[in-house]
Structures are given as structure tokens and as C-alpha cells.
């Protein structure tokens, strides 16, 4: 027991960090990096003997946690609320969007508010000097966009380059040359980087919230030019003899960086031929290009040559051989650029695309989602029903299942849209579930892309579920995805209605109509007509007929609320017929009879089925006046059923002499109109002969 006490005391003192003396201190020094344990509950050996079971303590390496690790841990403890809209919209309950259009307006307004706040902070920086954020958040503090160095020096030029002042940087460079000051090669290359990236034009206002008088004058000067362009970044073209070319020609010494910057700038702004010519000059000067320049040259090669596929593919292979000769190792973007270029040639590019994919794996480059996105487009055309699928999507999914991806290429967020589009074309629900499972693996959901990409993906996914899945599973997906993930399009709701029709679950129609109103589809005529047709097609139990009639009355109110847009075509005959039939079947007779006025008002011809049901309703209520009104409506449109309705009135109702005369006049008018129409047709036939 004394030995046990000694060992426990030593362990306690060593854990508490208390100093030891004498024999105990010596033992502790030897055992400071060791941990004692015994194979049994009691220690059989006394102090001073060998202690069995000594295990070396391995101190773990320091782990660097992400700044939002705590938030990520907390977020992992909760699930998505399927009854609410996406979290980005959960601000003011009165501002929560209810449709795709409103959600886009919400996001634009939110981004505009952020830009305005940033503009105010940068316009009045003296009022925002106190940093209250812990840790420091740079975007909450003012940014200084105006140069602080006023004299003419290379330091001033560097400052203007860092501030992305294109015109000011060029002016400072020219002033330095006029003063006889030699600008270093590094600074000149930085200036070329700025000019080539922005195409020798001032950046858009997204980069500068403060506009000085000089920049405003420059904006007015370039206004006419900018209007001819489709957009700032995508519309800028490379101008001949611009400042970049002028400064490049003035450089007394050029290195590989100078040439590579110019080549990439020319390709970025669609000066492909100039880029290829400059690459030839680079080779003549015995310089080597970097991998990013070769990536740009690959794009330029495909865009500039107006030849056949074999010629363009030969040029791409020649560039790859140049990379080998210059000992430039390709990266992921190299292969993705080649695959993106091969998409132009479809069937001809299938074999080269597979060779490129095998080469990637052979040199140890892991393909990204963008790689498989380009492969899909080489073998298939998502969304094109005329193209026969090559089924390569199955091989891709077998390779990707269970993997977690990180962003490596700007086109990574396009893979899931392409894959789900192929699933929709193939009508393969199991494959769609695999794609959706891959999306929900780890953080792959971040690659769903912007709002319109997400809507496209989930629309295709849910449409396929409506077409192929059982109705209970379909409704479960409906509750899970809408509106917590995306807002459905009216066509998506029509597909859901068709699924309900196939499964004989029409009792869900009133709920679908209620949801469609919340999602902003109240005035979608195709959706309203589909709902009315399904409700009016067959007879149902009384409780369901009452619910259908309420839904029909709500749809009727939606038609009537279209003040300016309401025209004759806004009230199709089918909708009028369905609403009247639903009112009759639910016992709302007066509302059904009121629908007859709408037929006359909008000049719509009622169906014979509706007239017969109206006649049955008049017979049940024993109302000869209503029966005669039905005959009058049929006579007004010269319907063939008018004579049969007249006979029903004569046989089924007790009418007076005045009503008999009215019926006789209606019958005579109908027969006269029939005679006139037949004579007109006979005369037309004789004239034709």
C-alpha cells in the first residue's frame, strides 16, 4: 500500500506542477514524459523496483481552428426548417419574398443597401474610425481610394497601381519618363498587369465608391464608348496601340513576365491573333511562358483558327509539347481549358476528351467538378431532346459518389445543373437521387451556384420526382423543398397537379391553389385552367365538391381582380364552364346561374354539358323561367342543342301561354339561322363549282 500511495502522490504532484526534492525529484525527472499504468487493480511491487507498462506520451500537434469554427459547430446541431423560407430572407416578416421574382428583388435590395453603407463609410471615413469589432473586420472600416503621395516618384506610381487608378497610373508613368526617371522593371510589370486586366480602362464603380471630379469626367468621356459594349468586363475589347502596347514597346528591358502579362491581357479581351504573334516573339527572344499563359494561348488557338477540328486539335497538342519543352507543368486549369474548348466540337472531341481525363489522372491532378461538367457537355447536350445521350453520366457518378469537393475552378458551380439536366433527359430518377446525394455530401451544397442555378436544379429534380415517384414520396419532397429551398415555377405546380391526377389524390388541389397564390402565381392562366379542369372533370363526394367550389370561387375572384389586364381572352370558355359546373355540383345554384351573364359578356360559347346540367338544376327547383333562360342562351349562339332543350322544357315543365310563345319564337329564330347558314354554304359550294 505504501508503494501505491507513493506512485499516486508522484502523479498528483507532477500534474499540479509542484516542485519535488530529493529522491522523489529524481524519479519525477525521469518520468516527466512518461505515463504510469498497471495491468491490475493493485500494485504488487514496492517503490524502487521496475515499474511495468511504461507508455510514451505523444504530444499532439497544434491544430489551427477556423475563425468560424464555433459557428460551424453550432450550425451542425440544427437542421433546416422546412416550413420557412431560406435563412437569407429571414429579416422582416413583412419583407419575406413569396416568389422567385420577389426573392431576386430582395437580394438586389440587400446588396444595394450594403453598397450604400460602404459608400457612406468611405465618403466620410472620419466618422468611422473606432474599431468595435473583435476580431477586426476589415470590411467594416473605411477604405482609402485617393492617393496620398503627391510628388512624382516611383512610390507614387506604385500607390496608384495598388489603388487601381488606371489613368492616374499611366499619367504618373509618363511624367516619370518625361522627368528622365527610370522606372524599375518590377513596377512597369505591375503597371502592365493593371492595364491588361482592365483592358486599359477604368474599373467599374463596383471597385470605387468615391468618385472624384477627374473620374467623373473620365466616365462622361467614355460613356459613348461604354454604351456600345454589352458589359464592362465582358464587353471590353483590346484596342490597337493602347497604353499597354505603348508602355510595352517603351520598355528598355522585357522579361517573361512582361510578355506573359500582355498575352493574357490580349486573350482576356479577345485579341487572339495579337496574343499568338506575341507568343512567337517570346519564343524568338528565348524566353519561357508560364502555365497561365499557356492556358490563355489554348483558348486563343481555338478561337482564332477557322479550320476543322483536326487542325485545332493539332495546335492544342503543339502547345502541350511546348509546355514539355519549356518544363512547364500543367495545372488543373490547363486541362479544364482544353476540355472547355473541346466542347465546341461535340462528337469529334469525345475521344480526345477521354485522353485528356486519363492524362490528368496519370500526372496526379485530381479532376474538379468543372472537369466533369465539361465532359458532360462534350458527350451530351443538356436540355437538347434531339441529342441522344451517351450515358457517360453513369460512369461519372460512379466515380464521384461519396467525394467531398473544394472550389478549384470558376465553373465548378455548373456541374450539378448539367448533371440534373441529363437525369431529366434520361428520365432516370435513381440517377437523380445519386446526384442529389452527392450535392448533400459534406460541403458540396456550396456548389449549387447562384439563385437562378439553384432554381434550375431543383425545378428539374422535383419535376422528375413528380413524373416518376409515388405520390406520397412526391408530397414529402414538396413539403421538404418548397419554400425552404426554392420557390416553384408555375409549370412545376402543374407537374405536381398531374401527379396528383395520376394517383387520384385530387383532394390536395385546394391546398396547391392556396400555395400557388402565396408563391405569386395567382394570375398564371395555365395554372388556373389546369386546376379548374381537374376539379370539374369528374363528380366527387359532397364534401370535396364544396371545397372545389370554394376554390373555384377564389379563382373567379382572381379573374375579376385583373382590372387593367382583364380582357376577353382572360376569361376562356373552359374556365367559365368549369366554374359554373363546380358551383352547380356544390349546390351553389345562384352563383352558377350568374356565370351565364359572363358567357354573354365575354362572348363565350357554353358547352352542351353545362346547358344540360343547368336544365337539370332548373328542373330540380321547378323553375320554368330558368329553363327558358337556358334555351335563350343556346339560341343566342345558334347551338344545335337548342331544339332538344326546347323539347325538354315543353315536356318537363308546366309553362303558360306566354312562355310557349317565347319558346316558339326562339325555335323559329334558331331554325331560320340554321337555314340561312345552310343556304350560304350551298351558294358557296355552287360558286366553287
Curated annotation (Swiss-Prot):
Entry protein name: Small ribosomal subunit protein mS39
Purpose: Mitochondrial RNA-binding protein that has a role in mitochondrial translation.
Location of the transit peptide in the chain: 1-37
Origin species: Pongo abelii (Sumatran orangutan)
An annotated GO BP: regulation of translation
InterPro entries listed in its UniProt record: Pentatricopeptide_rpt, PTCD3, Rib_mS39_PPR, TPR-like_helical_dom_sf
Modified residues (N6-acetyllysine): 126
UniProt keyword list: Acetylation, Mitochondrion, Repeat, Ribonucleoprotein, Ribosomal protein, RNA-binding, rRNA-binding, Transit peptide, Translation regulation
Domain of life of the organism encoding this protein: Eukaryota
PPR repeats by residue range: 149-183, 184-219, 255-289, 290-330, 331-367, 368-404, 412-446, 454-488, 489-523, 572-606
Subunit structure: Component of the mitochondrial ribosome small subunit (28S) which comprises a 12S rRNA and about 30 distinct proteins. Associated with the 12S mitochondrial rRNA (12S mt-rRNA).
